[in-house]
Curated annotation (Swiss-Prot):
Source organism: Staphylococcus aureus (strain NCTC 8325 / PS 47)
Further comment: Upon coexpression with Methylomonas 4,4'-diapophytoene desaturase (CrtN), CrtP produces 4,4'-diapolycopene dialdehyde, thus accepting 4,4'-diapolycopene as substrate.
Keywords: Carotenoid biosynthesis, FAD, Flavoprotein, Oxidoreductase, Virulence
Gene Ontology biological process: carotenoid biosynthetic process
This protein's name: 4,4'-diaponeurosporene oxygenase
Catalytic activity: all-trans-4,4'-diaponeurosporene + 2 AH2 + 2 O2 = 4,4'-diaponeurosporenal + 2 A + 3 H2O
Length: 497
């Protein structure tokens, strides 16, 4: 008899797991509380402006392409992606700008401010990150390893210690090889992909730089939600039964097994396996009602990553100095990270990510206008949450900074504005305390590891998404879904022997 898989949540991790399980011959039902598939890969349109509500950068497209190839199909028949050789522009408080290109040589050619020594050091750093990327690909990515002990067993103690560079933090690894202060800050902010601090995260995450340089940075034509739509179409073609607007209220358990889910309609649906794309702690807390002692232990070890104050601005002018992806850096990177990740306050001078897809895709704003998305990282929801007044002051701080750094009269030109706070993120995606990127990567607390993909309490419960390994970001959460499918397939194959 065909076994039944229930997937809770239709984010990229959930939909990719559903696709792989269906491709493997299982009966798969996916329940998503919202009316769209993609989770944080969401869309907002108003007054002629289009905005990606969630992720705005596509990297490592081969991870997505694999899902289509398993069905002997081509992703290009479902969605169009475009490579962006000019990856982003960095603005610094003293007026310095640095353009990051795909390729160290190209970056050197486009930045007269960078010396020969700067480029040599940047190449040296890329070589270092390549070594880390290659070894993590062998075990962490290809085999879905979940713990330090598994990595040591797979690679051997000395090989793991040296090549994963567990001795240093990410920023220490950068500062050891890069002397240019602008490059130090720019490279450190690659940690944005996982919503953590480069001063706390382990050096193994330096691989993010090599991933982007080697695999490229891509734009999904028409908006990144089209990628989620493509995966949904593939899932339906493979026989996945998708229920949107369907909220799971709890997971039923018996001893060390999960037996099914209770929907908000009262209906009970049985399952042989459950895959939760809801974050691990909210799943245990709200769907299983795990005891307080075990929850507290998990919360200490797996603290949420950062959240964000997200502004979607329709602007009645154009700023020619902006690229597609932009970063407006802080005067003091260490202080910014300290305030967000340790003091848990709204930062005085935040580093701001600004995406302006209209630079590449003119369908995203009316002629002569621009669609600007602004995202500074801020703490996840605290026991004493930030107030409406706190957020209003922070909004002014953001606009003051952007105007000071070259976006002249930005306030005057805003004709449309939509804002998301951590509370909105928590409400819409049931994320842990409104975190965007799952679990924080911290060398001391968790060695940069997220939750394991297999539940430690229930033998047929699995997790996908940003709160489990291999981590946050679109390719990683998509990969987590594929890895969970591999684990279930391997388990079933073993049981049949």
């Amino acid at each position: 008899m065909t076994k039944h898989i229930i997937v809770i949540g239709g984010g990229l991790g959930g939909i990719s797991a559903a696709i792989r399980m269906a491709q493997s011959g299982y009966s798969v039902s996916l329940y998503e509380q919202n009316n769209h598939i993609g989770g944080k890969v969401n869309r907002h349109e108003s007054d002629g402006f289009g905005f990606d509500l969630g992720p705005s950068i596509l990297t490592m497209p081969y991870i997505f392409e694999k899902l289509f190839e398993y069905s002997k199909k081509q992703m290009s028949d479902y969605v169009t992606i475009k490579r962006l050789p000019h990856q982003w522009r960095s603005f610094f408080p003293d007026g310095t700008t640095i353009d990051l290109y795909e390729g160290i040589k190209e970056t050197g050619q486009h930045n007269a401010i960078l010396s020969k020594q700067d480029i040599e050091e940047l190449q040296n750093y890329l070589n270092y990150t390549r070594r880390i990327d290659r070894i993590t690909e062998k075990g962490y990515f290809n085999y879905g390893l979940d713990t330090l002990s598994q990595i040591i067993k797979f690679h051997g103690p000395l090989n793991a210690l040296i090549n994963y560079d567990y001795v240093h933090t990410m920023q220490q690894a950068i500062d050891k090889r890069i002397s240019n202060p602008y490059l130090r800050q720019m490279l450190g902010y690659f940690i944005k992909y996982v919503g953590s601090s480069s001063y706390d995260a382990p050096a193994v995450l330096s691989m993010l730089f090599h991933m982007q340089q080697e695999q490229g940075l891509w734009y999904v034509e028409g908006g990144i939600h089209h990628l989620a739509n493509a995966l949904e179409k593939l899932a339906r073609e493979e026989g996945v039964t998708i229920h949107t607007g369907a909220r799971v209220d709890n997971i039923k358990t018996y001893q060390r097994r999960v037996t099914g889910v209770r929907l908000d309609t009262g209906e009970f649906v049985k399952a042989d396996y459950i895959i939760s794309n809801m974050e691990v702690i909210p799943t245990y807390k709200y769907l299983i009602h795990l005891d307080t002692q075990r929850l507290n232990k998990l919360e200490r070890e797996f603290e949420p990553a950062s959240s964000g104050y997200v502004m979607h601005l329709g602007v009645a002018c154009q700023y020619p100095q902006l690229a597609h992806h932009n970063f407006f850096f802080t005067e003091n990177a260490y202080l910014n990270y300290q305030q967000v990740f340790h003091e848990k306050v709204l930062p005085d001078d935040p580093t701001i990510y600004l995406v302006n897809t209209n630079k590449t895709d003119h369908t995203q704003a009316p002629v002569g206008y621009e669609n600007i998305k602004v995202l500074p990282h801020i703490p996840y929801i605290q026991d004493q949450p930030f107030t409406t007044e706190d957020y209003a002051k922070f909004r002014d701080k953001i606009l003051d900074k952007l105007e000071k750094m070259g976006l002249t009269d930005l306030r005057k030109h805003i004709i449309y504005e939509d804002v998301w706070t951590p509370e909105d993120i928590e409400k819409n995606y049931r994320s842990n305390r409104g975190a965007i990127y799952g679990v924080v990567a911290d060398k001391k607390k968790n060695k940069g590891f997220k939750f394991p993909k297999e539940s430690q309490y229930f033998e047929n419960l699995y997790f996908v998404g940003g709160s489990v390994n291999p981590g946050g970001g679109m390719p990683m959460v998509t990969l987590s879904g594929q890895q969970v499918a591999d684990k279930i397939n391997a388990r079933e194959a073993k049981n049949r022997k």
